[in-house]
């Protein structure tokens, strides 16, 4: 896949109009107007592969991988790979084959687990410190200065590692469903722009600094206590905790 994003932005400002209340760019002298133009271009190329396998409606496995090449990171870091793997085991299918399942009580049960890594690049032109026009001063002289953010040519891609394990259960001919999951998310090398000392000539600095870890549990219970040909009532209750 290839994703290319382009922006092209122009703006005009004018003040101290020659004719009052006539708001036109042409109604100002060259010393009282400013024109700016900005263009950006970003390209992201990705390659993706996936493998799926199953065995006797009991075991399922999915393995995938993606590699991205981005134009917004330095040459040594612009290629990054992130894989994922997930699997599940329908244990009620195994119990049924062995003759150990009473499906009038438990008619479906599945264990699942997954691990994934996801990469992310950054915005355009964050590697180098650019110049931009600051206005017209001193008898028409055009002013040029640094942008507010100092570039960083050592930036790395952001990464997030996620894991999840869970179980799904259905009872009494699918009248009662329980779904439980425990998950973790670990994000590191986050690209931030914290404030720095203005004595350096910049206000913000682009760096890899953020690291966020959280974990949590999700539980949902749904049931159909009343089910007839004429009436059906289903109730769902969900709960989530995270830290």
Protein language model features and the residues they cover:
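Extracellular/periplasmic, surface-exposed regions of secreted and cell-surface proteins
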Residues: 1-236, 242
């Amino acid at each position: 896949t290839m994703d290319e994003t382009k922006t092209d932005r122009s703006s005009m400002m004018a003040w101290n109009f020659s004719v009052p209340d006539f708001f036109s760019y042409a109604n100002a002298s060259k010393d009282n107007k400013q024109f700016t133009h900005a263009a950006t271009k970003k390209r992201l190329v990705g390659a993706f592969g996936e493998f799926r396998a199953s065995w006797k409606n009991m075991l399922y496995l999915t393995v995938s991988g993606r590699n991205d090449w981005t134009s917004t990171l330095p040459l040594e870091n612009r290629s990054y790979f992130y894989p994922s793997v997930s699997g599940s085991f329908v244990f009620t299918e195994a119990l049924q084959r062995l003759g150990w399942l009473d499906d009038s009580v438990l008619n479906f049960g599945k264990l699942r687990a997954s691990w994934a890594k996801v990469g992310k690049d950054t915005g355009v032109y964050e590697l180098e410190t650019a110049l931009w026009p600051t206005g017209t001063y001193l008898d028409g002289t055009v002013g040029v200065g640094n942008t507010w953010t100092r570039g960083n040519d050592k930036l790395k891609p952001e990464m997030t590692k996620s894991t999840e394990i869970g179980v799904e259960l259905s009872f009494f001919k699918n009248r009662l469903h329980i779904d439980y999951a425990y998950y973790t998310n670990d994000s590191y090398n986050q690209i931030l722009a914290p404030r720095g000392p203005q004595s350096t000539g910049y206000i913000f600095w682009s760096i890899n600094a953020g690291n966020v870890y959280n974990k949590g549990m999700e539980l949902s219970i749904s049931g159909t206590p009343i089910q007839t040909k004429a009436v059906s009532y289903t109730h769902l209750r969900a709960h989530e905790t995270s830290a």
